[in-house]
Amino acid sequence: MKILLFSDRKKVFEITNDITKDWSELIWYKNIDLEKKQYPLADIVIIDFDKNVEEKFLPIIKAKSKVGDFVPVLAIINGTPQEIFSVLKIGAYDYITTTEDIEAYRNKIEDIIRWNWYRKKYGRE
Protein backbone atom coordinates (compact mmCIF):
# COMPACT_ATOMS: atom_id res chain seq x y z
CA MET A 1 0.00 0.00 0.00
CA LYS A 2 1.27 3.45 -0.93
CA ILE A 3 0.47 6.52 1.14
CA LEU A 4 1.24 9.91 -0.36
CA LEU A 5 1.87 12.63 2.23
CA PHE A 6 1.94 16.33 1.36
CA SER A 7 3.39 18.32 4.24
CA ASP A 8 5.97 21.03 4.76
CA ARG A 9 6.61 19.82 8.30
CA LYS A 10 9.21 17.13 8.93
CA LYS A 11 7.57 16.27 12.25
CA VAL A 12 4.34 15.29 10.47
CA PHE A 13 6.35 13.04 8.16
CA GLU A 14 8.18 11.43 11.09
CA ILE A 15 4.96 10.75 13.02
CA THR A 16 3.21 9.39 9.92
CA ASN A 17 6.22 7.24 9.08
CA ASP A 18 6.37 5.81 12.61
CA ILE A 19 2.69 4.86 12.35
CA THR A 20 2.84 3.32 8.85
CA LYS A 21 6.39 2.02 8.37
CA ASP A 22 5.62 -1.64 9.06
CA TRP A 23 2.79 -2.03 6.56
CA SER A 24 2.95 0.65 3.91
CA GLU A 25 5.21 2.73 1.74
CA LEU A 26 5.07 6.38 2.76
CA ILE A 27 6.01 8.87 0.05
CA TRP A 28 6.65 12.41 1.30
CA TYR A 29 6.30 15.55 -0.80
CA LYS A 30 6.14 19.21 0.12
CA ASN A 31 2.92 21.14 -0.47
CA ILE A 32 4.56 23.06 -3.32
CA ASP A 33 4.94 19.74 -5.18
CA LEU A 34 1.17 19.64 -5.70
CA GLU A 35 1.70 22.30 -8.36
CA LYS A 36 4.14 20.12 -10.31
CA LYS A 37 1.89 17.04 -10.50
CA GLN A 38 5.03 14.92 -10.68
CA TYR A 39 4.31 12.54 -7.86
CA PRO A 40 3.38 8.85 -8.02
CA LEU A 41 -0.03 7.29 -7.80
CA ALA A 42 -1.05 6.16 -4.33
CA ASP A 43 -3.77 4.29 -2.48
CA ILE A 44 -4.27 7.05 0.10
CA VAL A 45 -3.38 10.74 0.22
CA ILE A 46 -2.74 12.75 3.39
CA ILE A 47 -2.55 16.54 3.03
CA ASP A 48 -1.26 18.75 5.84
CA PHE A 49 -2.96 22.13 5.52
CA ASP A 50 -0.57 24.36 7.43
CA LYS A 51 -0.99 28.11 7.70
CA ASN A 52 0.88 28.60 4.40
CA VAL A 53 -1.78 26.81 2.35
CA GLU A 54 -4.12 29.66 1.44
CA GLU A 55 -6.71 28.03 -0.80
CA LYS A 56 -7.80 25.03 1.25
CA PHE A 57 -9.64 23.24 -1.54
CA LEU A 58 -7.04 23.48 -4.33
CA PRO A 59 -4.63 20.83 -2.96
CA ILE A 60 -7.42 18.25 -2.81
CA ILE A 61 -8.54 19.01 -6.36
CA LYS A 62 -4.94 18.84 -7.64
CA ALA A 63 -4.16 15.59 -5.84
CA LYS A 64 -7.37 13.89 -6.96
CA SER A 65 -6.85 15.01 -10.54
CA LYS A 66 -3.54 13.13 -10.52
CA VAL A 67 -4.20 10.04 -8.36
CA GLY A 68 -7.90 9.59 -9.10
CA ASP A 69 -11.20 10.80 -7.76
CA PHE A 70 -11.83 7.66 -5.70
CA VAL A 71 -8.57 7.81 -3.74
CA PRO A 72 -9.44 8.83 -0.17
CA VAL A 73 -7.84 11.97 1.24
CA LEU A 74 -7.17 12.59 4.92
CA ALA A 75 -6.81 16.30 5.72
CA ILE A 76 -4.74 17.57 8.61
CA ILE A 77 -6.33 20.95 9.22
CA ASN A 78 -6.64 23.15 12.27
CA GLY A 79 -9.01 25.69 10.79
CA THR A 80 -12.39 27.21 11.35
CA PRO A 81 -15.48 25.02 11.10
CA GLN A 82 -16.17 26.64 7.71
CA GLU A 83 -12.69 25.72 6.42
CA ILE A 84 -13.05 22.15 7.65
CA PHE A 85 -16.50 21.85 6.08
CA SER A 86 -15.15 23.21 2.77
CA VAL A 87 -12.32 20.67 2.74
CA LEU A 88 -14.77 17.83 3.38
CA LYS A 89 -17.24 19.14 0.81
CA ILE A 90 -14.60 19.36 -1.92
CA GLY A 91 -13.60 15.73 -1.46
CA ALA A 92 -11.60 14.92 1.66
CA TYR A 93 -12.70 11.63 3.21
CA ASP A 94 -11.98 12.79 6.76
CA TYR A 95 -9.92 15.26 8.76
CA ILE A 96 -7.93 15.56 11.95
CA THR A 97 -6.90 18.81 13.59
CA THR A 98 -3.50 17.69 14.87
CA THR A 99 -1.02 14.85 14.67
CA GLU A 100 0.12 15.40 18.26
CA ASP A 101 -2.40 12.82 19.53
CA ILE A 102 -0.65 9.91 17.87
CA GLU A 103 -3.30 7.33 18.78
CA ALA A 104 -6.10 9.44 17.28
CA TYR A 105 -3.99 10.03 14.16
CA ARG A 106 -3.24 6.29 13.89
CA ASN A 107 -6.97 5.55 14.18
CA LYS A 108 -7.77 8.01 11.36
CA ILE A 109 -5.15 6.42 9.11
CA GLU A 110 -6.39 2.90 9.89
CA ASP A 111 -9.98 3.99 9.24
CA ILE A 112 -9.14 5.47 5.85
CA ILE A 113 -7.24 2.29 4.95
CA ARG A 114 -10.28 0.16 5.87
CA TRP A 115 -12.51 2.44 3.80
CA ASN A 116 -10.15 2.16 0.84
CA TRP A 117 -10.12 -1.64 1.11
CA TYR A 118 -13.92 -1.76 1.36
CA ARG A 119 -14.34 0.60 -1.59
CA LYS A 120 -12.00 -1.47 -3.76
CA LYS A 121 -13.67 -4.74 -2.81
CA TYR A 122 -17.33 -3.70 -2.95
CA GLY A 123 -17.43 -0.32 -4.63
CA ARG A 124 -16.47 1.00 -7.98
CA GLU A 125 -13.18 2.30 -9.26
Predicted segments — roles?
Residues 7-32:
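Two-component/phosphorelay signaling modules centered on CheY-like receiver
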Residues 115-125:
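CheY-like receiver
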Residues 100-109:
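C-terminal output helix
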Residues 96-97:
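A structural signal for hydrophobic residues in beta-strands of small regulatory alpha/beta folds
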Residues 85-89:
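Alpha4-beta5-alpha5 "output face"
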Residues 1-3:
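Extreme N-terminal starter segment of soluble prokaryotic enzymes
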Residues 33-70, 77-80:
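Conserved phosphotransfer microenvironments
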